[in-house]
Structure formats: structure tokens, C-alpha cells
Amino acid sequence: MFTLIFLFLFLNIPLLVADFISPRCFWKMKQNEYRDRHHGTGCIFLILAIQQPVKKEYFSHILNIQTHTENHKYALALAFSIYEINRNPDLLPNMSLIFIFSADSCEWESELSLIRFGLQNSDNLPNYLCEELTKCILALTNMNWATTVTLHTILSNFLSDQLLHITYGTFHPALSDHEKFPYLHQMASDHTSLALALVSFIIHFGWNWVGLVISDSDQGIQFLSYLRREMEKYTLCFAFVNMIPLNINLYMSRAEVYYNQIMTSSTNVVIIYGDTDSTLAVSFRMWESLGIQRLWITTSQWDVSPSMKDFTFGNKYGTFAFEQHHSEISGFKHFVQTLNSVKCPDEYLVKLEWMHFNCEVSASKCKTLKNCSSNHSLKWLMVHTFDMAFIEESYYIYNAVYAFAHVLHQFTFQKFDNLPKDNGKEHNYSCKKLYSYLRKNHFINPVGDRVSMNQRDKLQEEYDIVYIWNFPQGLGLRVKIGMFSPYFPNGQQVHLSEDMLKWARGSTQVPTSMCSADCGPGSRKFRMDGMAACCFHCKPCPENEISNETNVDNCVQCPEDQYANTEQNHCIRKAVVFLSYEEPLGVALSLLSLCFSAFTTVVLGIFVKHHNTPIVKANNRTLTYLLLISLIFCFLCPLLFIGHPNSATCILQQLTFGVVFTVSLSTVLAKTITVVLAFKIIASQRMMKYFLISGAINYIIPICILIQVIVCAVWLRASPPSVDIDAHSEHGQIIIVCHKGSVNAFYCVLGYLAILAFGSFTLAFLSRNLPGAFNEAKSITFSMLVFCSVWVTFIPVYHSTKGKVMVAVEIFSTLASSAGMLGCIFVPKCYTILFRQDQNSLEMIRVKSSSNVHVS
């Protein structure tokens, strides 16, 4: 035991020491004088197991620890856990756990004097029991990893069989090496889910540009690798990564660089991760005091609650802390509220206020404190001084004490059951055996949480998200606003009560932290070489491409039947355009077609009615009727071009056009040949006369039609007309027209019609001066001249237009050429039949014939 005293003097570090001595020396000391100064980071506790009950008043002396708030929380957590265990009849029955520590400050000199006094004057201690069963030392510490390694190494050399070392601080990978530290156990988990929790939290607020400040240590580098891997999955970027060196001299030489990097960075969110007793803590406090306006994200071990004395610049954004989730410890607040000092009921309140307001405490007990008031309730202080809900380290202490109690329970009663009841000699066992039990131990703690002492069996951590609410300045409320659970689906792992957030001194607007402004709908991201994945420029989408989300890498091409709107964030279905009966142009052309066909029908009726008149007889009534009927169909052909095209109408358009016009032109050709033969034949040409009289000339018509039908058949065989959907010629429109199929075949049809028209024109032109009262040569000449002019003009105009205008040009050409033949050949005759009947007689025919002969 004197070796242990030497180690305490040498290390000058706080320990929580559990000494299983059943029973050893139990006594209670009175309070000593307070010393107004700051001390170490913890207190030394001796935890003993005795075979008698312990009253609750025993725990009141823990309130006399005059140290900073963090240690006070740990001491209260230790006292409460021991208090619960002692009240549990199923855990360590007939045994009680107690702790011994100095009534003065938690400094090693007073604790050492307590240990020395207890060991040297054990006979004078009350409740002394002489039977000593065995000993085992539990070292429960919260130090940085280097100090922990030093402590564990030294204690192991001196107390290898009596050391059971448990840490409740931050997990460090170096301490998880069981070969180097076989009897060291870490209560904290390795925080494998912390990186995912931070990334999910960042994504929840739409941030992608954050800064990171870590300690330049193995722990910091490991956390950086975890965090970088998670951030790369979701395209999040570091604005900067500051690795704060542990060496104070190296840090001081670069402190200004770290400060300028944070100040000049465009990010508003900075993550802090590292040891709280390192140079990183110095940096963080300095940045806070200088009023750097950033939103800080830390872990639970950082005490980021501002004190009421910190009336400096203040941070308008506040701080978030991630704490390991655990159920609420019921009864803890009531336990603390019912604890009072023996002599001075208000003394505990005064001490809490001293810790909160940084007041000066008088050297004597129960005196009025300078600049302080003791009239506040304990309940208020528990909320505003420090939250009495268990923090992460307090919860580790709670579970560590319970784990130790369970191990003692299992080992002790199993051992006693297996012992022979003989001479009652001392049965010694080492902490090595206890540790083998401890590593395998798992239990359900009183709040219902499953606790496993095996690191491999520990579940992924859930985290409570705490917001340090500092509005008004200095309030420093720790408010739980949500939690993170890795067991929920992606995107639903963070749950926040955002109505509890107050940004920028009361504002509800979430601060932004983006490397680049969002590329809104209608644009895409464009990165230059060397830019981070989160940094980009915005470029509008190309023509007929859209983006309906923010920050897309590539725009999406609209389908063939759709086009992009002016904002290029939505595809609009293109209007289907064709020459329809509903639009004015279609209505006009269809009416014009019907009117011409009706007029032609009237002309046909006139000729039929006056079929015995000389003017009708003189021009071959059969050919006249055939020509008028074909013209009726020529005028009706445009109706096939109007309306929604389909495969049938597309084929009928061209075939009907070609065949019907062939009938018309071949009839005109036959009439022209008839005129020529009638006036050019001489008496010796009996064969020609027979040919004219017999009507053999009429066979020209079917022969011409047959040739055109053969051309059309070849056309249909090679490449028939079909529906053509043109989605590119006009913006926002799908033009549906009939494609000609084989263009060569189409021009062959037109060419054949041109040959017939040109032949008729030539013969009629040569016969224009032949005698005869009703010579049609001149009429046919003019009609063919109109026909040829129309279709010669049609070709260039047809190729220069598209869509329904092109269809309208073809319809107009059909109507114009047909109207030319109707007007030039039949309108003058109708005028004569209806209005100049005096000229439609045999006498007038003889007069005209004789005059024509005389002139000739």
C-alpha cells in the first residue's frame, strides 16, 4: 500500500480507486476548510465493500468538493451509482459500496494524507472489521492517452495482481491493444458512427463546405480518415483541415496561421475534434473569445457552455455537441436535490453559484459570498449552472461502477459457493481473474440500456444532438434538439426539432455553408481543373435540354415529342402540327376545293343539258364529259391532303393526284389530236379519216393512264409514301406530313404529267389557227400554258417550304392547274351556251366556218 502512496506522489494525477476490502476501515470525516483555487481534473476515490448498510447522509460530503463543475458532475454520478447499488437487494447482498476522499479540495496532498491516516490509525476508525478477505484496486480515470499509458505502465509494474484499470474518457485506438495493456479497459466506444452522424447532420441542413480542426495525433488522423470517407460518399468537401500540433511551442509558432485560415475561409461551419486538454482546446477558447462567427460542431467531452463571466464578443450561431445517446437516469435529479450539507443547507447552492458566476468564496463556511446570491433554488441552478442530466462521461462512470459491482457479485458468490467450509483461512484472488470476468460481462443497467464490456459486441452508437443556446449572451443552455440513429434508413437517420433552434440571435433562418451558390433548375455544374467537388460554376443547359433539380452535373435531353421551356427546367409536349380542317388555311383550301368541284359539276350539268347543241357536239361530247369528271376529282384531291395524315391517306394523295391528272391531261391530249386530225386530214388519207371517225383516238386515254399506273406501281413497290414526323424543323412543334417515299418516283409522276401537258400544248399551239367555229386549240393552248406555268413554279417553292405550308403549296398548285383548264376550256363555252345562244346555232357555225376559210 505504501507503494501506491508513492505512485500518487509521483504522478500527481487524479484517480478513482476502488479497493475491494471486505470489510476494511469505514469512517466518516467532517468537512475541512475550503481553499479558493482551481485544482486538478479529478478526485481520488477509494471504493470499498463493507458488510453493513450505509445511510444516505453518508453521500452528503461529496458536495464539499471545491473544484470545477466537470469533476463535480463525475463525483455526483459516482455517488448516485453507488447509492443505487447499495439499495439493490439483488446486487451484492449483505454488502455495501462506499468511497473515501478528502473533505478538502480534490488535490493529491489531502487525499494522500487521508490514505496515510486511514492505514496508520485503522484501530481508531469506527465500524472497523478485522477480517480481511482480499484486495483489488480499480483505477477509474479520465486522462489523455499518454498520461493513461504512463499511469497504467507504472501501476502494472508495482500492482500487477491488484490493478483493474478502467477509463471513462474518450476512446483512443492506442489503448485498445490488449497485448500492451492486458488489464486496461475503455468504457467509451470507438465512435465509428460519429463520422456518419456528422455527415448526416451536415446533409440535413444542406451544407457541403465545412472546416475541420483536429489534434495532430493518431486519434485525430483516424477520425479524419473516417470523416473523409463518409463525406466523399455524399460529395461534401473540406474548406480546410487544421491539424493542431500537440507541442505548445510548435503550436504558438503557427497559431496566427490557424486563426487566419478560419477567418478567411468562406465556410460557416467548423468541426472540432480532439483532446480537451491539448493545444486544440487553447485554440478553441481563443477563437471563441475573439468572436469568430462560426457554427461550431463538437463532441460531448468539450465543455462549450459559456460562463456568465464571458461577456466578450459572443457567437451568433451557437454550438452543436454530439453526445452518445442513453436513456434518462431516473432518480438522479431527486438524489442531487435531496443532498445537503450537514451544517449549512444553503452551502451547496452557494458553491454551485460560485462555479457558475466565478465568484470569490470566503475562506470560512456559511459566510456571505462576494458578488453572489444564495436565494436561487437548486432546481434553477441545476438547469442554468450545469445540466443534471447525465453527460457521456457520467454515463460511462455509471456503467463502470455497475459493471464492477456485477463482476464482484458473480466472482464473490461463485467463489464462496465453491469453497469448502473449513478453517476460514483467507482466500486470495487477483484482479487478473476479475478482469477476465469483466471483459465478458454484459448486463442491462437500471435504465434499460444493454451494456457490453466487450468492444466487439458493442452496437453502433446513437447520438443525442445538443444545441448550446447562448441567446441572450451568456445564458449557455444545453438543449437537446434531436438525435441520430444509424439503424434508420439513409436520409432519415437524423431527427431534429427545428422549432427549438434559434439562429443568429433569434432568427429561424438556417445559416448557409456552401462553396458555390446552387445551380438552380435550368443550369448545370461546370468545374474547372483543380476545383473541389463541391466548388463549381453554373452554365445554362444547352438548347432543348433541361434540369429540374439543383446542382445537377448534366442536363437531360427532352424527348423527341417534347421541348424545353424558356427557363429550361421543364419539358413541354410539342404541339402536333398538320394542315387541319379547324385552322383558317385548311378551311379556306377545303372550301375552295369544294367550290371548284361544285362549279365543275354545274358546268358538267350545263353540257349534259345542252348536249344536242352545236357547240357541245362539235367538241366530242364523250371527251368533254370525261374531262369534266376528271376535273371534279382533281378539285377533290386536295381534301386528301387536309387532316391528320396516316398511311392510307399518304398513299392515296399521290396515287389519286397522279392518276386523275393523267386522265385530265390525256383527255386534253386526245381532244387536241382530234382537232388536228379533223382539220389536217385530206381525202387521200382514208386510213386517218377512218381512225378519226371510228373513235380509235379515244384509246390514247387508257394507254396514257396505264403508263402512269405502272409508274405508280413501281413507286409503291420501291418506296411508298408514308407518314413523316418532323420534330426538329420548328421549335415546339411536331410537324406531321406525308413523306413522298421515293423522291425520284414522285418526280417521274410529275415528269410524265409534264410530258402530257407539253405534248398537248405543242399540238394545240400548232393548231390554234385552224378553221372552225368552235376550234378548241386556242383554249387548250392557254390551259396548258397555265398548267405548265403553275407546276414549273411549284418545284422551287415546294422545296423552300416545310410542314403544312408545303402541303398548302401542293394543294394550291393542284387547284390552280385544274382551275386553269376549267377556266380556259369550258368557261367561254358555258358563256356562249347560257348567254350567247344566237351563236350556238348551225347558221352561225356556217358563217364562222366560211369566214375562217376565207381568211385562211
UniProtKB/Swiss-Prot annotation:
The lineage of its organism: Eukaryota, Metazoa, Chordata, Craniata, Vertebrata. It comes from Mus musculus. Expressed in the vomeronasal organ. It comes from the Eukaryota. Residues 608-622, 680-690, 767-778, 828-856 are cytoplasmic. PROSITE patterns: G_PROTEIN_RECEP_F3_3, G_PROTEIN_RECEP_F3_4. This is Vomeronasal type-2 receptor 116. Keywords: Cell membrane, G-protein coupled receptor, Glycoprotein, Membrane, Pheromone response, Receptor, Signal, Transducer, Transmembrane, Transmembrane helix. Receptor for the Esp1 pheromone. Mediates the response to Esp1 which enhances female sexual receptive behavior (lordosis) upon male mounting, resulting in successful copulation.
